[in-house]
Amino acid sequence: MSRLYRIIPMRILRRTPGVKFDEMVPSDIPKIDGIDRVIHGANSISPGPIDDCTPPVQRPWYMHPGQDDNLMVLAGTRYIDIYEPKSKQKASFIVTPEKVYKNDKLYFDGPAMVVWPAGVFHRIISGEEGSISVNFSTRTKKFDLSNNFNIYDLCTETGDYKLLKDGSEDQPDLTYEYPNENIKSLFKS
């Protein structure tokens, strides 16, 4: 059976007035290939609705074929749905910096990392205050940035899914734009 998720608790290291200091036990630290800072505004939905398909899909899903997500919420609230298509397992989490709820019940009373493997569909809503998280990505041999953020329509009853949007369409062009050709030629020579 495929693994749907894992919770990695943080260990309380120290508490002083106004300061909470927690650590992850070294044996629990995942392999880290990338560190992603993700900031959501109030009531953000990720991925957002896809209206240019028939019918429009209000709550689509991401699925990373080559990346495990190791998500830690630092501020605000994240409402996370995950779904594994082979086993048809689904779980919903409400994650804050201090607690993790699973399917609306307190699951862990403390700071923790929520982990799901490559191939698991997921979608997120941030609370009224927005949210900030850090994702410590573990990338497999199948990792490819061009499809890592593809957006899907998913039927959680059958496990059937279809591509709605190529994730590469949202990737920015990171090429520097020189103010003029003179500067560019001087710089490149």
Task: Locate predicted features.
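Histidine-centered metal-chelating micro-motifs
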Residues: P111-I124
